[in-house]
Amino acid sequence: MAAEDIAQLADCLAKANVGDGELSFKGKTLKLNTAQDAEEVIREIEEYEGLQALRLEGNTVGVEAAKAIAEVLQRKPDLKRCHWSDMFTGRLRPEIPTALRSLGDALITAGAQLTELDLSDNAFGPDGVRGFEALLKSPTCFTLQELKLNNCGMGIGGGKILAAALTECHKKSSAHGKPLALKVFIAGRNRLENDGATALSEAFRLIGTLEEVHMPQNGINHAGITALAESFKANSLLKVINLNDNTFTEKGGVAMAEALKTLRQVEVINFGDCLVRSKGAQAIASALKEGLHKLKDLNLSYCEIKADAAVSLAESVEDKSDLEKLDLNGNCLGEEGCEQVQEILESINMANILGSLSDDEDEDDDDDDEDDDDDEDDENDDEEVEEEEEEVEEEEGGDNENKEKSKEIPCLSGSAPASPPKLPVDASTFLSFPSPEKLVRMGPRRSAMIAQQVNVADTEKVVQAFIQVSSVYREDGEIKAAVEETIDGLMKEAFENRGFQANVFITSLLVQMGLLKSEDKMKTIPHLNGPLLTLNHMVQQNYFPKSLASTLLAFISKPNGVLENNASARHTLLCNLHNL
C-alpha cells in the first residue's frame, strides 16, 4: 500500500468508531486484497472493546483479507450485528463463498450470538449461500432476529439451501429450549421463483415469529404466492408484507386475501406490480372489511384492477383510521372510476390517503371471467405470466409489432376481439407524459423517433430525454428492452455529435438525480431506480466514453441516503463502473 493510501485509511479509521458498540467502515471504498491491506482494519477491530456491530458495507474484501479479519473476529464474542452488504465488489464469484466461510467460522469460534446478519448486494449466487450455510445452522444464529439477503442472485437452488439451513437452525435451537425467533426476512431480487419461495414458506411456517417479509422481484407466480400465503397464517405478528413485482393473478390474490383475514398486526402491504386483477382485489377488499385495522399503507398499483374492484377497496377502508396511503395508480379505473374512488374517499374524510392516479388506463370491456378460466385451464404452467396474452397473439396472427405483453403495463391483456386497436404513440406524446405502455406502443422505430425529436446538440435536452426514458424502466423484458434500445439510439447519436458536451451531460444528470449540489434550486428525480439501471446499461456500451466512468464512480460510491434507498441498482452500477 502506498504511504498516501495508508494515511487516507488511517483518517477513515479515526472516524470509524460511531458509538453504541458499533465500528463502521461503511462506504469507505477500501480495497482489502491481502492481510497487509487489512492491517489497520484488523487493529481497530482488535482494540475495540465490547464490539457489538461491525459495518463493512461499501468496501471490497478478498479471500486473504477475509481470513485475516476472521482471525481477530474469533476473539469478539459480543458481536451481534454484522452489516456486511456490498463488500465483494469486483470479486470473482468463487472467491465469495470462501471469504464468507472464513468470517462465519470465526463468529462460531467466538461464540457470538448474532441478532442481525446483512449480506445484501453481494452477487454470490447459490454457491454463496453455501458459504454461510454452516453459520446459519450454528448456535451463533440461534438468536438471529433479522436476516437480509437482498439482491444476492440466490436463485431457486440458493433459496432451497437457505430454507433448509433456517429449518435446521430452528430445529437445533428448539432442542436447546429457545427456538429461532426471526423477525425480519429480506430477500428481494433473487429469482427465487415458485420452488424457492415454496421451500422458504415451509421454513416460515415453522418459525412463526416473522414481523416483516420483503421478497419483491423474485419471479414468483400464483403457486409460490399461495405457499407463502399459507405460511403467513402461521406468523400472526406480521406487520410488513412486501411482494412487489411478482405475479399473483386471481389465484394468488384470493389465497393472500384469505391469509390477510387471519392477521391482526399488518401495517404495510405492498402488492404493487403483482397482477392481482379485479377478483384478487375484491378478495383483498373483503379482508379489509373484516380486519386489518392497523393498516397504514396499501399498494395495489399496476395490478390490472378495474373500477368496480377499486370502488370496493375504497369502501373497505372506511374504518381504517391509521391508513396513510392507498396506491391504486396504473390500474384500469377509467375516468369515471377514478372519480368514483375519489368521491367515496372524500365522503369518509379520507381523500388525502389516495395516491396519484396519473397512470390510470381506461377500463377495458373484457370480462375477468374469461381470463380466470384461462388460469384454471393452465394448472401446470406456473412459469407463464399471463395465459391470455397467448390468446391475443393468436387473434392478431402472431404479429408482435406494437403488442403490449408485460404485466407491468396495466390492462393490456384479454382485449375483446371487437375492441379497436390502440393507436401508435409519437415521440412528442411520450416525452410529454412518459409511461411504459407509451414507449412500447411507439413500436420498433421508437429509438429513431426519440433521437429525431431531441436536439442532441443541446446537452440539457438530452439530459431531460434520458430522464424521461429511464423513468419508465421496468425489469420486465419487453419494457427493459424498449428503454435500453431507445437510450442506445439517443446517446450514441449524442456522444457522436460535436455540439454535445459529455462532461456537462454527466454533471447535469448527477444534479438532477440529487447526487450533486447545484447553486440553482431545482426539482430532483423522485425515483432513482430506473435512471441508475439505465445508466448501468449505458456505461457498458461501446459508444460510452470510458473517461466519464471515474466521475460517475466518485459520486455513485459516495454515502447518500437517496442511493441507499436504491441499494440494489446502485450496487449493479458500481460493479460495472469498477470493471471499466
From Swiss-Prot:
Bias kind Acidic residues: ranges: 358-399
Entry's Gene Ontology cellular component terms: cytosol; kinetochore; nuclear envelope; nucleoplasm; nucleus; perinuclear region of cytoplasm; spindle
InterPro entries: ARM-type_fold, Leu-rich_rpt, LRR_dom_sf, Ran_GTPase_activating_1_C, RanGap, RanGAP1_C_sf
Pfam families per the UniProt record, alphabetical: LRR_6, RanGAP1_C
Post-translation changes: May be sumoylated.
Species of origin: Xenopus laevis (African clawed frog)
Gene expressing this chain: rangap1
UniProt repeat feature LRR, residue ranges: 48-71, 111-134, 141-168, 207-230, 235-258, 292-315, 320-343
A GO MF label: small GTPase binding
Protein name: Ran GTPase-activating protein 1
GO-annotated biological processes: nuclear export; signal transduction
PANTHER family: RAN GTPASE-ACTIVATING PROTEIN 1 (PTHR24113:SF12)
Family: Belongs to the RNA1 family.
Record note on quaternary structure: Homodimer. Identified in a complex with RANBP2 and the ubiquitin-conjugating enzyme E2 (UBE2I).
Function of the protein: GTPase activator for RAN, converting it to the GDP-bound state. Converts cytoplasmic GTP-bound RAN to GDP-bound RAN, which is required for RAN-mediated nuclear import and export.
Keywords noted in UniProt: Centromere, Chromosome, Cytoplasm, Cytoskeleton, GTPase activation, Kinetochore, Leucine-rich repeat, Nucleus, Repeat, Ubl conjugation
Annotated region described as Disordered, given as residue ranges: 356-429
Subcellular location: Cytoplasm; Nucleus, Nucleoplasm; Nucleus envelope; Chromosome, Centromere, Kinetochore
